[in-house]
Amino acid sequence: SAGSDVYKRQTYRINHPRHVMSSGMLPSFNVLGEELEPCSSDPLTGWFRDGCCNTDRNDRGLHTVCCQVTTPFLEFARQQGNDLITPAPRFNFPGLKPGDRWCVCAQTWQDAAEAGVACPVDLGATHEESLQIISLELLEQFAL
């Protein structure tokens, strides 16, 4: 039942050794309530550039959705002022091409979905904080 799933998830979090993070990073759970899986090491993604869509309170953009980017998504993001194509070495950002996996901002992905250009999502590697902005049902429609 749904209630027992919530209980199991809460129990797992409490008993899981990674629950307490000294770095201020929020606990690493995905939108399915399981341990967060890596998103990409090539290119190396994540707010912390650790390959995962981890987040903390300083990540105002919530870079938490693990996507396999597409040309329509990249063009949409650029039109919105979020250029994910052009390399920015000072931010350790290589620039993305279609097929790359990247932790994108939850609001950018939500806006792209509303515009009909959402890209595929890896649910296992998408941080649960994404659910502040995007419904699980919508994410599931674009699951890899």
Placement of each model-derived feature along the sequence:
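Short, small-residue-biased leader/transition segments that mark boundaries at the very start
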Residues: 1-7
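A charge-rich, low-complexity, intrinsically flexible signal that marks solvent-exposed coils, linkers
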Residues: 22-144
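Intrinsic-disorder-associated, low-complexity terminal segments enriched in Asp/Asn/His/Tyr and depleted
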Residues: 12-16
